[in-house]
């Protein structure tokens, strides 16, 4: 993935809103853009085969 563990932490340690796909802080409970309550953790693995 990323070259450095620091970069990987910064890029992948996020939550994604299930409604508007906004990136949120890992400690967020609601979306910062739309206020939606359902957030998922960003995938650590790429979707490609």
Curated annotation (Swiss-Prot):
It holds the Pfam family Ribosomal_L40e. One of its GO terms (cellular component) is ribosome. The keyword Iron-sulfur does not apply. Keywords: Ribonucleoprotein, Ribosomal protein. Disulfide bonds: none annotated. InterPro entries: Ribosomal_eL40_arc (IPR023657), Ribosomal_eL40_dom (IPR001975), Ribosomal_eL40_sf (IPR038587), Ribosomal_zn-bd (IPR011332). GO terms for molecular function: structural constituent of ribosome. It comes from the Archaea. Belongs to the eukaryotic ribosomal protein eL40 family. NCBIfam families: PRK04136.1 (NF003161). This is Large ribosomal subunit protein eL40. It comes from Methanosarcina acetivorans (strain ATCC 35395 / DSM 2834 / JCM 12185 / C2A). The gene is rpl40e.
């Amino acid at each position: 993935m990323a070259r450095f563990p620091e970069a990987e932490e910064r890029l992948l340690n996020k939550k994604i809103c299930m409604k508007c796909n906004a990136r949120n802080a890992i400690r967020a409970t609601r979306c910062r853009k739309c206020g939606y309550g359902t957030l998922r953790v960003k995938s650590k693995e790429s979707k490609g085969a």
